[in-house]
A protein has these predicted regions:
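Structured helix-beta-strand junction loops
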Residues: 37, 63-64, 125, 160-161, ...
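Catalytic cysteine-centered active loop of the rhodanese-like fold, especially the PTP/DSP P-loop
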Residues: 162-168, 172
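Short secondary-structure boundary segments
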Residues: 111, 132-134, 167-168, 195-196
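Conserved, mostly hydrophobic/aromatic
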Residues: 19, 34, 43, 67-70, ...
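Low-complexity, Gly/Ser/Thr/Pro-rich intrinsically disordered linker/tail segments
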Residues: 170, 185-199
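A generic structural signal for well-ordered alpha-helical segments
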Residues: 34, 60, 122-125, 184
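Active-site beta->alpha N-cap acidic-glycine motif
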Residues: 1-80, 84-98, 102-104, 196-199
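Alpha-helical scaffold elements lining the catalytic groove of polysaccharide deacetylases
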Residues: 24-29, 75-103, 113-160, 173-179
């Protein structure tokens, strides 16, 4: 079904993606860091996110990032009927299109939960399912393990074709992002976007 989880192992491209369920005050800094380092990323947003942070979504788009669908209510897709999935995906799709004139085409299943049925159905709706090759426990705001932990986790898991999943609500990530990007580039990697994805 042409889903994306890991890119070409022989090509030194890496892909940076963020999941944005709600805003904790760090996304502006993340966008600043990406801009300063000339890196384009993908941000997967929920309806709650765009309804409360339309200005940040607008900035993501204006600065050339991909905005992806993380569904209206962040429900596990395998539990839903096709009709419910369609609503979860397309209501957000329509909302983003009406507000920003932007047609989303990548989806990240809530909680990373999917099945062949959901991936195939999302494809029929015009969506490529995007998973990841690396994620870590950065999403829990109450259990941030420190910047050196975050940096080590990220840098230890970089490889050709890596699809990196970070959460926009992580204070540690936002603080070490610039250092990580510079270190990854120094190791000879290029940050590519999902639009340039190499299988």
């Amino acid at each position: 079904y042409q889903g994306i989880a890991m890119g070409n192992k022989d090509s030194k491209q890496v892909y940076l993606t963020f999941d944005e369920g709600y805003e904790a005050g760090y996304t502006e800094k993340i966008l600043d860091v990406l801009k300063e380092n000339e890196v384009k990323a993908a941000f997967f947003i929920t309806a709650h996110y765009v309804n409360t942070n339309a200005d940040l979504v607008k900035r993501m788009l204006e600065e050339g990032h991909i905005v992806g669908n993380h569904t209206v209510n962040h429900k596990s897709m395998p539990d839903l009927s096709l009709e419910e999935i369609k609503k979860e995906v397309m209501d957000l799709h329509t909302s983003i299109y009406e507000r920003f004139g932007y047609e989303m085409k990548y989806i990240r299943p809530p909680k990373g939960e999917y099945s062949e049925r959901t991936v195939a159905y999302c494809q029929s709706l015009g969506y490529t399912t995007v998973m990841w090759s690396f994620a870590y426990d950065d999403w829990n705001e109450d259990a941030q393990k420190g910047e050196s932990y975050a940096k080590k986790k990220i840098l230890d898991n970089i490889h050709s074709g890596a699809v990196i999943l970070l959460h926009g609500n992580s204070k540690d990530n936002s603080n070490v992002l610039a250092e990580c990007i510079q270190e990854i580039k120094a190791q000879g990697y290029t940050f590519s976007t999902l639009d340039q994805f190499e299988r």
